[in-house]
Amino acid sequence: MNILFGISDTQECYNAIKFAVKLAHSLKEVRFTLLHVSMEVFIYSESGMMDYGQTEALEEEKAKALLKQFEDAFKKENIECESVLKSGDLIDVVLDMAKDYDLLLIGASESNLLYRLFISHQNSLVEQSSIPVVIAK
């Protein structure tokens, strides 16, 4: 089974690692791809403190560190995984990649009510995905 695990820097996503590990150990053959979609960097005014290139490099560095954290958690459990870092619209990128997988795994939306109502991409992914979606918490 090929599983796309959409990761982010939220507690709910870190909690989803436990579910992913249990799932991996319950299946004979499983391949995980860890996907982090970083937002495109836009700078509207020149502050003189940091330029676009520096900001973009910082965001990429943070994203790579996040992927490494998740990779390490999987390796600790002897689960093979591949990491992919993309930038762009989260929904578009995830749905495009999901076409090549059997299952999409995402962490539950953050607990904060305002976040769930206005920022969460969870509902869009569930409604628009062509493959089954598991929301782990």
UniProtKB/Swiss-Prot annotation:
Superkingdom, taxonomy of origin: Bacteria
InterPro entries in the record: Rossmann-like_a/b/a_fold, UspA
One Pfam family, short name: Usp
Family: Belongs to the universal stress protein A family.
Protein's UniProt name: Universal stress protein HP_0031
Organism field: Helicobacter pylori (strain ATCC 700392 / 26695) (Campylobacter pylori)
